[in-house]
């Protein structure tokens, strides 16, 4: 009902829902696909909206092409397998929040998702990505989708206020900054509980520490701004708890 109401209020926009009735039961090999001529019609409208949004935000833009790199698809499936087997909660979240992942080739795109194509992740892996990069980007976009769903129930953030973004040079609407904070908190929460060994151990520790610093800086901007709803404030408190727990455990491990 909430989704139908959202669609009804946005009739001028092309809106697609990839969270179908049975999407959570589909296998990951079915849900992770490469963008190719035979499925072009399925994703053309989505990729057009991605291109328009990138240009609207004055970001560097390069055309989105088909992807013939099946190795990227295998890497994504490996990352999902690692996350899914790490915990039942993660497996449930992945299956219910991600309806489809489409792999494209685009120099200026990393990954993106939107409430306008709910449940779909558009991703453009790079040759130098490690398994860690795949995991982080999947969690990143999954977190955005989770928040889009929550915002169908409650806006969480008031409009008309601009704040500093941890991922952009220019100030962004408070909603975008709230999304950034939520993504950072989810990256910390999920990845801190993963076990990285060998060549991934140090980069994982460095990236998590960087994420914690960015989250602290980002959450501080919502203090005394009065731009969050009651539910939004509650979520900000939960993010603060994730940060505090990470900092506490990180300081203990440093002593040990």
Regions found by a protein language model. Give the residues of each.
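N-terminal low-structure segments adjacent to metalloprotease catalytic domains
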Residues: 1-52
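Long, acidic, intrinsically disordered low-complexity segments
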Residues: 75-82, 86, 114-147, 242-256
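Post-HEXXH active-site segment of zinc metalloproteases
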Residues: 114, 128-136, 145-175
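Auxiliary, metal-adjacent structural segments of Zn-dependent hydrolase domains
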Residues: 53-117, 127
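Pan-zinc metallopeptidase signature
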Residues: 205-256
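Short, charged/polar micro-motifs that form catalytic or ligand-binding hotspots
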Residues: 62-73, 124-137, 169-180
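Short, glycine/acidic-rich hinge or "gate" loops at secondary-structure transitions
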Residues: 93-95, 155-156, 197-207
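Post-HExxH zinc-binding segment in Zn-dependent metallohydrolases
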Residues: 162-199
């Amino acid at each position: 009902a909430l989704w139908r109401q959202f669609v009804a209020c946005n009739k001028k926009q092309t809106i697609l829902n990839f969270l179908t009735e049975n999407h959570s039961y589909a296998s990951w090999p079915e849900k992770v696909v490469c963008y190719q001529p035979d499925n072009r019609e399925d994703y053309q409208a989505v990729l057009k909206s991605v291109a328009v949004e990138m240009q609207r935000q004055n970001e560097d833009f390069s055309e989105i092409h088909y992807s013939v790199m099946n190795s990227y698809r295998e890497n994504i499936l490996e990352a999902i397998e690692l996350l899914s087997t790490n915990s039942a909660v993660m497996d449930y979240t992945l299956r219910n929040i991600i309806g489809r992942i489409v792999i494209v080739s685009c120099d200026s795109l990393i990954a993106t998702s939107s409430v306008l194509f709910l449940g779909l992740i558009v991703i453009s892996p790079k040759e130098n990505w490690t398994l860690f990069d795949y995991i982080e980007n999947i969690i990143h976009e999954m977190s955005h989708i989770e928040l889009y769903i929550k915002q169908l129930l409650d806006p969480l953030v008031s409009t008309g206020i601009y704040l500093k973004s941890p991922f952009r040079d220019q100030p962004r609407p408070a909603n975008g900054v709230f999304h950034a904070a939520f993504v950072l908190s989810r990256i910390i929460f999920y990845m801190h509980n993963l076990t990285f060994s060998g060549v991934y151990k140090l980069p994982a520790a460095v990236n998590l520490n960087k994420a914690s610093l960015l989250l602290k800086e980002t959450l501080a901007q919502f203090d005394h701004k009065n731009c969050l709803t009651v539910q939004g404030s509650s979520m900000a408190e939960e993010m603060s708890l994730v940060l505090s727990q990470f900092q506490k455990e990180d300081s203990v491990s440093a002593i040990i």
